[in-house]
């Protein structure tokens, strides 16, 4: 049975199921491409920014700006570009940037959730409509005769839409769970990298505060005053 025959025998519900399958495949391909880039580049990008921040804070900002097409770089850039922030402000900037980037990384999840929920229901609807059509032609006097053979065939064809809906939902659910696992792993990476950057900044901030207290270096506020 070729795809065209399946569409014809599956009934009217096969057309919305076809649209959902196309939407599911396109979303899965886009997410696979996105996560492939994230997995390959995140650790390398984060290590380069952290290593640079340990040596030169200004250079680390430029490195993060050059790599800001990656979520991890956008996350680290948010607190890095603040002018002399208090450690608490630095921490809040990290948290806010993490929330923004992690939310963007879940793009497409709602589409897959809708497909997972709708596909079986549409398949079941197609089966019910097919059964109604098949059984409506049966008369009590036809029971046990050869005329009921077509009804049996019609019931079998009516189940095609249910099978199609389940297949779409199962495939979408499998990839949805994979993407969820990748997202949770990335959340742990964000937490680890953010903590390392915060430690580096607190160490830098306290060293500068000690220098200000000793009178060796003018404070940032004093540097900003007109001469």
UniProtKB/Swiss-Prot annotation:
Transmembrane segments: 10-30, 111-131, 155-175
Compartments in which it is found: Cell inner membrane
Domain of life (superkingdom): Bacteria
Record's keyword terms, sorted: Cell inner membrane, Cell membrane, Membrane, Protein transport, Transmembrane, Transmembrane helix, Transport
Membrane topology: Multi-pass membrane protein
InterPro entries to which the protein is assigned, alphabetical: ExbB/TolQ_transport, MotA_ExbB_proton_chnl
One Gene Ontology cellular component: plasma membrane
GO biological process, one term: protein import
Keyword Membrane: yes
Described purpose of this protein according to its UniProt entry: Involved in the TonB-dependent energy-dependent transport of various receptor-bound substrates. Protects ExbD from proteolytic degradation and functionally stabilizes TonB.
Similarity annotation: Belongs to the ExbB/TolQ family.
Protein name (database record): Putative biopolymer transport protein ExbB-like 2
Lineage per the UniProt record: Bacteria, Bacillati, Cyanobacteriota, Cyanophyceae, Synechococcales
